[in-house]
Design a protein with these regions (language model features):
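Short C-terminal tail/terminal secondary-structure segment
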Residues: 91, 221, 232-233, 244-258
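Short, small/polar-rich loop/turn modules that mediate ligand/substrate recognition or access, typified
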Residues: 169, 174, 243-245
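Active-site helix of classical SDR
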Residues: 117, 153, 161
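Conserved glycine-rich cofactor-binding loop
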Residues: 9, 16-17
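Alpha-helical segment proximal to the catalytic Tyr-Lys
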Residues: 122, 166-167, 241
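Substrate-binding pocket helix/loop in short-chain dehydrogenase/reductase
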Residues: 90-94, 98-106, 132, 213
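Residue(s) in the substrate-gating loop at a strand-loop-helix junction
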Residues: 137
Length: 258
């Protein structure tokens, strides 16, 4: 199936690993040129052809603008994937989450998307076309005190997606989001990931924590980064030409409500 992405320029944030890296791979596989923004690069990212890697701190007010400026040197941005984000389990409760913790979560997980979108949008508006895909989370609507600041930031991102789609739809620009459940990335399964952090605090092993999480899903397993990336690429493509303002769960059946 031709996704109509050949020779289009895409910007992907949080691109050096996990869902971001998988999305870069998938876009390149569809013939797109990608400007990949991340705080640090990775060998896996650097080895990909058709990728312009930009080292940038997207949690800062000027980082997103610098990323988009670098993309403009390559061409006109037609696709934006706002993927960057981070989560820290707050196992000591709400009162232990400091002002700095809240600001860090909001800056990276929500405001980075706002700022990158704001920087990329003028060129899309001038062209009268474009697609923005925001990587949200099931935690946008599954309230969990263990990730309270992350959940609030993702809820803001999902609301931002819906609201912006209403403004930009008449001007040829689509805005959608995907909401993964647990994904088999370092965010969950790494040495400092969610499973390891919870295991250290509560006892047991990271593997046992991960198995318990997987057991809550109808499929009994974590989603892979490539599966999320495939959904992102579909939404970014011309195959989803009349899809906007929508959020797509990819959670293995974790969410049981209608």
């Amino acid at each position: 199936m031709d996704m109509g992405l050949t020779d289009k320029l895409a910007v992907v944030t949080g691109a050096s690993k996990g869902i971001g890296l998988a999305t870069v791979r998938a876009l390149v596989g569809e013939g797109a040129t990608v400007v990949a923004g991340s705080r640090s690069s990775s060998p896996e990212l650097e080895e990909l052809a058709g990728v312009h890697s930009v080292k940038v701190d997207l949690s800062t007010p000027d980082g997103p603008e610098r990323l988009v400026d670098a993309a403009r040197e390559v061409g006109a941005v037609e696709v934006l994937v706002n993927n960057v984000g981070a989560v820290t389990p707050r196992l000591e409760g709400f009162l232990a989450v400091t002002e700095d913790d809240w600001l860090a979560s909001l800056n990276l997980t929500f405001l980075a998307a706002v700022r990158t979108t704001r920087a990329a949008l003028p060129n899309m508006l001038a062209a009268g076309r474009g697609s923005i895909v925001n990587v949200s989370s099931v935690n946008a609507f599954l309230a969990d005190p263990v990730v309270i600041d992350y959940s609030a930031a993702k809820a803001a991102l999902s609301n931002f997606t819906k609201a912006l789609s209403q403004e930009l739809g008449p001007r040829g620009i689509r805005v959608n989001s995907v909401s993964p459940g647990p994904v088999s990335t370092a965010l969950w399964l790494g040495d400092e990931g969610v499973a390891a952090t919870v295991a250290q605090a509560q006892g047991g092993s990271p593997d046992a924590v991960a198995e318990a999480a997987a057991g809550q899903m109808a499929t009994g397993r974590f989603t892979t980064p490539a599966e999320v990336a495939d959904l992102v690429v579909l939404l970014a493509s011309e195959r989803a030409g009349n899809v906007t303002g929508s959020d797509f769960l990819i959670d293995g059946g974790l969410v049981k409500t209608l």
